Design a protein with these regions (language model features):
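Short alpha-helical segment of the dimerization/phosphotransfer core of two-component systems
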Residues: 23-28
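A conserved beta-strand-to-alpha-helix junction within the catalytic ATP-binding
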Residues: 49-67
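Conserved catalytic submotifs in the C-terminal HATPase_c
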Residues: 49-53, 71, 76-86
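Acidic ATP/Mg2+-coordinating residue in the GHKL
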Residues: 132
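Short conserved segment of the HATPase_c
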Residues: 137-149
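Short helix-loop "hinge" at the ATP-lid/N-box region of the Bergerat-fold HATPase_c
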Residues: 105-107
Length: 199
């Protein structure tokens, strides 16, 4: 920006400088927001509102918001959510954040061409599976991906902030559920969330 202010760059080069600066500002804002969320979670200051809602409808609404973004990234998608009602107690904001973080992780890191979300349910629990066909995660990285600030790509150019998956895990735990990951390098990654029907 100093180069722009001092008129060292002009025209198309100036526009590119401004575009890069705006992108970095957006990433910084996103990082601060996510970091603030993690701090509140870590300190036990996050307030949750558990309400009875239809998990299937909520999942459909979340995915409907994601479809344009997936299409803009040339990702094909497969969404399998039962048409039946599945009433359970969840914090809808937290559940939305869980799915958003998993899908954002795929967009940012996986280099995938396909993503899927599958919801299946029993009387006792709901199973939500988010999968991609991307580059996968190495066996050495896999045990650590839910740790705070952990990034599989250790280069300085690594995208993301290393908080998305750890926040997702914390939010799943708040629902007394579990989240696991399985991955085959070069073939893709599968995240499986198990949520009990009754909290």
């Amino acid at each position: 920006l100093e180069a722009v202010e001092s008129k060292m760059v002009t025209g198309a080069e100036q526009e590119e400088y401004i575009r890069v600066a705006a992108e970095k500002a957006h990433h910084l804002k996103e990082f601060v927001t996510v970091l603030f969320e993690w701090v509140k979670l870590d300190a036990g200051e996050q307030i949750f509102h558990f309400e009875l809602c239809d998990l299937n409808e909520l999942s459909r609404n979340i995915m409907a918001d994601w479809v344009p973004l997936l299409e803009s990234h040339d990702l094909t998608y497969e969404i399998e959510i039962p048409e039946t009602e599945y009433m359970t107690r969840v914090d809808s904001t937290a559940y939305t954040r869980i799915l958003n973080n998993l899908l954002q992780n795929i967009l940012t890191h996986s280099v995938a061409s396909q993503v899927s979300l599958t919801v299946t349910e029993t009387e006792q629990q709901a199973k939500i599976v988010v999968a991609d066909n991307g580059k996968g995660i190495s066996a050495s990285d896999l045990p650590h991906i839910f740790e705070r600030m952990y990034q599989c790509d250790h280069s300085r150019a690594a995208k993301g902030n290393g908080l998305g998956l750890s926040i997702a895990k914390e939010l799943v735990s708040v629902h007394k559920g579990t989240i696991t990951a399985a991955s085959i390098p070069g073939a893709g990654t599968t995240f499986t969330i198990m949520l009990p029907k009754a909290l």
